[in-house]
Amino acid sequence: MTELNKLTVADSIKGLKNKDFTSAELIGAHIKQIEKHRNLNAYVTETFDLALKQAEAADQNYAQNNARTLEGIPFAAKDLFCTKGIRTTACSNILKNFIPNYESSVTQNIFDKGGVMLGKTNMDEFAMGSANITSCFGNVISPWKANDDNADLVPGGSSGGSAAAVSGFMASAALGSDTGGSVRQPASFTGLVGFKPTYGRCSRYGMISFASSLDQAGIFTRSVLDSSIMLEAMMGFDEKDSTSIKAEVPELQSAIGSSMKNMKMGVPLSLGEGSIIEPDIMKMWQDTIELLKNAGAEIVDITLPHAKYGVAVYYVIAPAEASSNLSRYDGVRYGLRVERENMTLDEMYEMTRSTGFGEEVKRRIMIGTYVLSSSGMDAYYLKAQKVRRLVANDFNNAFAKVDAILLPTSPTAAFKIGEKQNDPTIMYLNDLFTIPASLAGLPCASVPAGLSARGLPLGIQIIGKQLDEYTVLKVASTIESGVKHIKFEPKGF
């Protein structure tokens, strides 16, 4: 029998319904795995007492035939989803001991469906990073190793703790947030399915903000079916979030295994020209195109002429919004306060923020403050907003001809911890292929599609039309079936 902590969400639900095991046993297996692999630093707060209590309630519901959709299923939450009475830090010193008195809508939705929370996962500070190396709790180590080297690898970022937890069988699923690729890129690095829904599909209420016009909750799972199950539970209109979309939550599970016949897949191959894309990634992209063609899809060459400006646009707009959002952390209302005798209010602000924020966060606040200044507004911010509109228009034009778009998730496989740490520009380019869809607010997923020559997982990205998560899942499911001969599982786990 498969170890309980290695079961997918769908198989766990089936086993619990058939009374093959209890939720308490399922949760116990995950707790053992977390304790065994604490060296990966995937979790920053463990909620085992809560999880065992929730598991006991789940077993009672199964006994009484009152089981809900996710009854007894173990999940983890990135540490920027506020959890009532449970420390929520965004992995920043400025919020290191913050305990919210309210619950985020997304975690509440999962609790309402019977989900069991194992803990809060590590992340880049305030979700700013692509390698999970900016956390005040230390970096996360990927469960994966290259077959020619035993060096520790990054799990991707900013949701690296969630990716490591699911990839290392320390959770069946895990919540992340995706601003410019922070679910999709770690999923690619760790051999997982990472899904970012349409902007506004999942409520942002109770999510600690980075860039409000880009932030969206997402999910890590080990199968496309699991993604559809979790998305159905997470999504929905929320009057507490002014950016929430008033649209019915669709039935998504029937997308799994649907035919690709007569589907048109857009492929912007020109985006790979002259970029930093590795040969392994290019081969995986070409192989996936052939896979979809053989499955009945029509491949259409498209262009996204403004997508190449995506990284530049993102690193103007996102820091600008961060500069505004993070101004609330001043040492007055909540979080860290640095004080000394005879200190003025301005000195308290300065010392609190200088001490509380890490280097990458300070860098982005400074960039954002400049582009919002009188000298930077016209030259950078307003121009970036115009180009963002052009990026969205490019997608609209493409979707007039195709049903979905296929791109690599990342230009590289996972790299060594510290390898790119001293060059922010190189680090920012990790999001080269994920940022354009974020700027347009589109649903997208990364699904494992191959292994590099060094044995590391590579993800392919599917981008859909607004509110068309169904088609994204359909394509992802076809790719998943086409590579089922590949085992996307780290050695030793």
From Swiss-Prot:
GO biological process, alphabetically ordered: translation
Domain of life, source organism: Bacteria
InterPro entries according to UniProt: Amidase (IPR000120), Amidase_CS (IPR020556), Amidase_dom (IPR023631), AS_sf (IPR036928), GatA (IPR004412)
UniProt GO cellular component terms: glutamyl-tRNA(Gln) amidotransferase complex
Active-site residues from the entry: K78 (charge relay system), S158 (charge relay system), S182 (acyl-ester intermediate)
EC number, as in UniProt: 6.3.5.7
Gene Ontology MF annotations: ATP binding; glutaminyl-tRNA synthase (glutamine-hydrolyzing) activity
EC supergroup of this enzyme: ligase
PROSITE patterns associated with the record: AMIDASES (PS00571)
Ribosomal protein is among the record's keywords: no
Presence of keyword Ligase: yes
Catalysed conversion reaction: L-glutamyl-tRNA(Gln) + L-glutamine + ATP + H2O = L-glutaminyl-tRNA(Gln) + L-glutamate + ADP + phosphate + H(+)
Keywords from the UniProt entry: ATP-binding, Ligase, Nucleotide-binding, Protein biosynthesis
UniProt record similarity statement: Belongs to the amidase family. GatA subfamily.
Matching HAMAP family: GatA
Function: Allows the formation of correctly charged Gln-tRNA(Gln) through the transamidation of misacylated Glu-tRNA(Gln) in organisms which lack glutaminyl-tRNA synthetase. The reaction takes place in the presence of glutamine and ATP through an activated gamma-phospho-Glu-tRNA(Gln).
Record note on quaternary structure: Heterotrimer of A, B and C subunits.
Record protein name field: Glutamyl-tRNA(Gln) amidotransferase subunit A
Species in which this protein is naturally found: Rickettsia rickettsii (strain Sheila Smith)
Encoding gene (name): gatA
